[in-house]
Amino acid sequence: MSLFGTNTGFGSGGTGVFGSTTTDSHNPMKDVEVTSPPDDSISCLAFSPPTMPGNFLIGGSWANDVRCWEVQDNGQTVPKAQQMHTGPVLDVCWSDDGSKVFTASCDKTAKMWDLNSNQAIQIAQHEGPIRTIHWIKAPNYSCIMTGSWDKTLKFWDTRSPNPMMSLQMPERCYCADVVYPMAVVATAERGLIVYQLENQPSEFRRIESPLKHQHRCVAIFKDKQSKPTGFALGSIEGRVAIHYINPPNPAKDNFTFKCHRSNGTNTATPQDIYAVNAISFHPVHGTLATVGSDGRFSFWDKDARTKLKTSEQLDQPITACCFNHNGNIFAYASSYDWSKGHEYYNPQKKNYIFLRNAAEELKPRNKK
């Protein structure tokens, strides 16, 4: 029996509709609270692809679980199912047809979760925790790409226990993104590698990092023809780099900007600087969202090089974000990211996932 259309909720929790009136410090933007969030820090979020009717949200957490919610048209969320790993879940993704979800964990395995049967099977194995997982749909092949702290990038046919290909990286994989035919992987020690995926995956170029501090997140952006043309890279130093792969004028087209900083404005009063935890591009407008350890999200227009909006400050960091397939819903997760160490961890604090109506706020600035 399909899970879609049945309510197999896993507990109770608060929810609402767009425009609810709560004013708690955990939800200063008055956004919709997703029902039954995970019991530990939320590491990743992913919305279902456009091939699926409706909107389904997947979230992975440090409680070793992956959860699925249906997001109804009125903003209500219905818990559908969950699966477990034996270690924290670090990344999730969907197959292009929406029938499968893929999960990557610190337990050194990746799993394929069939949502119709609610069965999950192991499809990948590394010698270290798996940090990233992406579905690749090429004209001549489809596979899963996993990036690990064992310094390898592996490509898996889900029907085979052995990888189709294994590529060595100079360092541990910290973040990655895929928009066919491009993949970008950022590693420890500020490594940055672009891969081309046509015919078969291969290393295309190593790039000197435009950022001076540890890489935290990366997201590929597209041109007006929907072809991947560059990426945004976020670091722990409250900064994002916009980098084109083949820009007409590299010195002019590539740039960095500061974000997720507060207080001080000059050298006499230093700024508080926070990590950029996630970056997500709007699927229609090409604008982007960043979320940070400062507990804020911001929306940006990279082409106009301007900020569109910054949220009020939540009472804990924002650890993950994503847009649904048509860009109408922005999901973001609020939970502790351990950026201030164990002494700032409060086990009494709940974790939250919020949904925001993003149809208007992400529209690019009008060109004058």
Curated annotation (Swiss-Prot):
Q: Which Gene3D superfamilies match?
A: YVTN repeat-like/Quinoprotein amine dehydrogenase
One GO BP annotation of this record: RNA export from nucleus
- Cellular-component GO terms for this entry: cytoplasm; mitotic spindle pole; nuclear pore
Which residue ranges does the record annotate as region Disordered?
Answer: 15-37
Q: Which residues form a coiled coil?
A: none
Residues making up the signal peptide according to the UniProt record? none
**Where would I find the WD repeats?**
37-79, 84-114, 125-157, 168-206, 215-255, 271-301, 310-346
Which terms are listed as keywords in the entry? Cell cycle, Cell division, Cytoplasm, Cytoskeleton, Mitosis, Nucleus, Repeat, Transport, WD repeat
Major subcellular location class: cytoplasm
**SUPFAM superfamilies assigned to the protein according to its UniProt record, in alphabetical order:** WD40 repeat-like (SSF50978)
- Annotated Gene Ontology MF terms? RNA binding; ubiquitin binding
Q: From the Swiss-Prot or TrEMBL record, state where the protein is found.
A: Cytoplasm; Nucleus; Cytoplasm, Cytoskeleton, Spindle pole
Described function? Plays a role in mitotic bipolar spindle formation. Binds mRNA. May function in nucleocytoplasmic transport and in directly or indirectly attaching cytoplasmic mRNPs to the cytoskeleton.
Q: Which family does it belong to?
A: Belongs to the WD repeat rae1 family.
This protein is called mRNA export factor
Q: Which gene encodes it?
A: rae1
